[in-house]
Amino acid sequence: MSGYSRRKFLTRASCGAMSVVVGARSLQAAVSGNDLDEFIEAEMQGQRIPGLAACIVKSGKIVWSKGYGWSRVKRHVAMDPDRTIQNIGSISKTVTATAVMQLWEKGKFELDDDINNYLPFSVRNPSHPDKPISFRCLLTHRSSIADSPAYMSSYACGDPRVSLETWIKDYFIPDGRYYRREVNFHPWSPGKKHRYSNVGFGLLGYLVEKLSGESFTKFTKRTILDPLGMKTTGWMLSEIASESHAVPYVPVNDGQVNKVLQAYKKVGILGGEVERDPVRGSYQPVCLYSFPNYPDGLVRTGVNQLARFLLAYVNHGVYGGARILEADTVQLMLTRQNATTPHQGLCWATLPHEGQPHWFHDGSDPGIRTSMSFRPSDGVGAIVFINRTDVDLKKFNERLYRESARF
């Protein structure tokens, strides 16, 4: 499946026997066939991937999960679908969208309402001041809100240094620190065109705070993460066990990522001693970073933890006896919202694969690449986490769906 990525970071303003060491395995891995292992290991060597964890879900449960390679190359810490945590990029948007739709279910707003009715300040595209931006516009990337250079430069090591509220106000209020009308907004009116917007999802996170009266992190923990039993998942480094966090990497001596290396150095998140793997090459570590617009991409979790969230969508809003959304709400989110953008639902996107629709979201950020998807027709889904930048996930996803027939 082709990706629906967060972005190419800082490059676009908007998505035979091998001696590869296999990392820790989950209980389900005992049923793994050698062919799948060999395929994954060969792809990891070919794409210079330090570590990978993945799972297949089917019949309402995880039927296979396994880790390969290293979450921390120098220390030889194995990638593990149970224990390894990493930031998952734009897959996080599905958690944010879930929180938004929980509030919609409670009657807090209507999807086509003007968001200004729920904000303490006005958000308008200055080129179209009379055209409101709706919740639906934000959830379908039709808000006309752009990701400016200020957004691209907001990454820093550690947890965010400013609050979500401060960031959002500085971005949208005309006298704010980051307000630049010519780069914070596209020239077209809200609703007219589809253009991926990370800042738009930060704004949705802020709206969750205003509508719920709670911080975004507390609301999502109370209504999504805790009910699903995602006990080791969080948004902030302070909320998770940092020793379990995979190190994000970029490969060195690779002409395709030289510009990426320079971009990461510019914002101060790349550094440290080069770490070497005898099979897959050398890597430059990226620090454990964050950004103030975090509702658009900063969930930190493990593969098997995230599978609980995915299975809730597969099972029409419920997992393990905990309902996070009504079935009709899930169906609405997995419905095409605009004829001119037939792949786009509410946050989730769809593409056909072997003649059947798959709903998915990918993630891409410095040192990570991720994907989460499922096929509603039979409830089969897959998750892939990788701790390096700019990896093609299509082959991995296609192979996992093919392997699902064995279970």
Please describe what each predicted stretch is.
Residues 1-17:
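N-terminal secretory signal peptides and thylakoid transit peptides that target proteins
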Residues 25-28:
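Sec/Tat signal peptide C-region and signal peptidase I cleavage site
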Residues 31-86, 110, 177-187, 356:
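Short, conserved catalytic-motif segment at the N-terminal edge
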Residues 46-53, 75-138, 185-200, 294-297, ...:
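Short active-site loop at a secondary-structure junction
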Residues 70-73, 366, 389-391:
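A short acidic/small-residue loop/turn micro-motif
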Residues 72, 127-359, 364:
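Short, surface-exposed loop or secondary-structure junction motifs
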Residues 354-357, 384-407:
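Short, gly/Ser/Thr-rich active-site loops of penicillin-recognizing serine hydrolases
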Residues 361-362, 369-388:
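Short, well-ordered beta-strand elements
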